[in-house]
Amino acid sequence: MAHHDLIQAEEALAESKYSDVVMYAQQSSEKIAKALLEMERHFENIHDVSDIFYVVIMKDKKYSAYENDFQMVRKYLRWLAFHWGKSRYPVLEGGVVVSPLDRYDKNFAADVLEKAKFVYDVLLKVLGEVHDISS
């Protein structure tokens, strides 16, 4: 499912649907992180999993070989979660309602997609190496 969301994000980028890129990229990262959390029998129905990721995954010694990558993964998870609502719903900012359609541009969307791909690649590798899950 996380991979499907990455594909959707890539297609949205090609179609200049930048808020959709952000939405699908965030969703992909959340899903792959929750897959790893599920392997530890820990699941919470929230969108910002960065703190849970830290407590459950990063503090577990069996994942110590991934510490450097996990620092970036956690940073990206938090950053992507910040955009969860903003990529989906209008938000009042400075007395003005800002639509997701007006919030993001091509460069921002491409950067978001790269961050989501990093999260996906790292966590898929961990799922494969630690838990013998390949997709």
Features from the language model and the residues they span:
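Terminal alpha-helical segments
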Residues: 1-135
